[in-house]
């Protein structure tokens, strides 16, 4: 019997980074209807930085969270509606609102050393009848044993699964393998993996995760996402089918959604350009890229220098304000 792999598609959440959070509710509904018809298990919807993310710091979205969720929930027939929540950005009220509009799955995302700040949100989600998944961001920054400790915390709070998340697209297949194997051996809940393609390794890393025991993996149509994007859902489905895995996704239909519905809405090609490659090389949070590109233009400095310095400083999600500081200091140094 073929091994079942659950695909969570994040085109309508991670993909929001690549369009500056400007998908309209109508565009989201159109994409979601296609993903649903293709057989995607779970469709994640929200601002790129999760529920409540629309703000000056993270970028204002084209519409409110509830407008997106309402629009998507009305077109789903089989897929589960999911959301992302970062404690400190999203609130318990946001969770309650999401549940009201039909969200069945929430991924509670914390920095890879801070699972404890997600305890309240995991427990509230469970009380609301939602599937709650712990999402350990920037997992390349700590060794496997630290991720084990944090994954066990999420499990103790009641999480239904735990994700190892390569937010910077900085991992190699070996990095993924040792982390997934360690966490898989330590928890009794399913383990998942979320990839970014900044080193061109998103699909390879996702396969390494599956071989190491992950049964939940992420993708986005056309790879739409922060930095160089994510694992392309349509490629992931094709490769997993060749390897004998069962995803429940219709390959032709997911190809059609990617090419005919998502591609025309893309602002720029989702490629590993020099800026995205610098993200992965430096190990910098993927959503920093567009902010860094704007700062580079404003201060007339090389975006790569900004990203490398942010990596040296070991910045994490939530420290977007440092991008301008770094760009300013580089500009000042260049004039001396």
Curated annotation (Swiss-Prot):
Site keyed Transition state stabilizer: positions: 13
EC number(s) reported in the record: 4.1.3.39
Residues binding Mn(2+), per UniProt: 14, 194, 196
Occurrences of domain Pyruvate carboxyltransferase (ranges): 5-255
Residues the entry annotates as binding substrate: 13-14, 167, 194, 285
Entry-linked Gene3D superfamilies: 1.10.8.60, Aldolase class I (3.20.20.70)
UniProt keyword annotations, A-Z: Aromatic hydrocarbons catabolism, Lyase, Manganese, Metal-binding
GO molecular function, one term: 4-hydroxy-2-oxovalerate aldolase activity
Entry keyword annotation includes Lyase: yes
Keyword Manganese attributed: yes
GO terms, biological process: catabolic process; L-leucine biosynthetic process
Catalytic activity: (S)-4-hydroxy-2-oxopentanoate = acetaldehyde + pyruvate
Residues of the active site: 17
Pfam families attached to this UniProt entry: DmpG_comm, HMGL-like
CDD domains: DRE_TIM_HOA (cd07943)
PANTHER family according to UniProt: 2-ISOPROPYLMALATE SYNTHASE 1, CHLOROPLASTIC-RELATED (PTHR10277:SF9), HOMOCITRATE SYNTHASE-RELATED (PTHR10277)
Family designation: Belongs to the 4-hydroxy-2-oxovalerate aldolase family.
The protein, known as: 4-hydroxy-2-oxovalerate aldolase
Organism: Carboxydothermus hydrogenoformans (strain ATCC BAA-161 / DSM 6008 / Z-2901)
């Amino acid at each position: 019997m073929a091994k079942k792999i659950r695909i969570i598609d994040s085109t309508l959440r991670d993909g929001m980074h690549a369009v500056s959070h400007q998908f309209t509710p109508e565009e989201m509904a159109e994409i979601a209807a296609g993903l649903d018809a293709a057989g995607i298990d779970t469709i994640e919807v929200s601002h790129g930085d999760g529920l409540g993310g629309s703000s000056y710091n993270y970028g204002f979205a084209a519409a409110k969270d509830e407008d997106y969720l309402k629009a998507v929930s009305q077109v789903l027939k089989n897929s589960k509606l999911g959301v992302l929540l970062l404690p400190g950005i999203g609130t318990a009220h946001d969770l309650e609102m999401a549940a009201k509009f039909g969200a069945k799955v929430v991924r509670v995302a914390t920095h890879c050393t801070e699972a404890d700040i997600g305890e309240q949100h995991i427990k509230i989600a469970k009380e609301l009848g939602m599937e709650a998944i712990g999402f350990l961001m920037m997992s390349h920054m700590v060794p496997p044993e630290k991720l084990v400790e944090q994954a066990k915390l999420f499990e103790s709070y009641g999480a239904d699964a735990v994700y190892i998340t390569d937010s910077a697209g900085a991992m190699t297949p070996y990095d993924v393998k040792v982390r997934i194997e360690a966490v898989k051996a330590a928890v009794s809940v399913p383990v998942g993996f979320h990839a970014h393609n900044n080193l061109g390794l998103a699909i390879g890393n996702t396969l390494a995760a599956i071989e190491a025991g992950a049964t939940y993996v992420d993708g986005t149509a056309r790879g739409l996402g922060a930095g160089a994007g994510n694992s392309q859902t349509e490629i992931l489905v094709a490769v997993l089918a060749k390897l004998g895995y069962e995803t429940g996704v219709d390959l032709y239909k997911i190809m059609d959604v990617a090419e005919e519905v998502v591609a025309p809405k893309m602002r720029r090609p989702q490629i590993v350009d020099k800026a995205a490659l610098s993200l992965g090389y430096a190990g910098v949070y993927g959503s920093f890229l567009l902010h860094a590109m704007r700062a580079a233009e404003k201060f007339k400095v090389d975006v790569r220098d900004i990203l490398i310095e942010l990596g040296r400083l070991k910045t994490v999600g939530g420290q977007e304000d440092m991008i301008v500081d770094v760009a300013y200091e580089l500009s000042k140094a260049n004039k001396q």
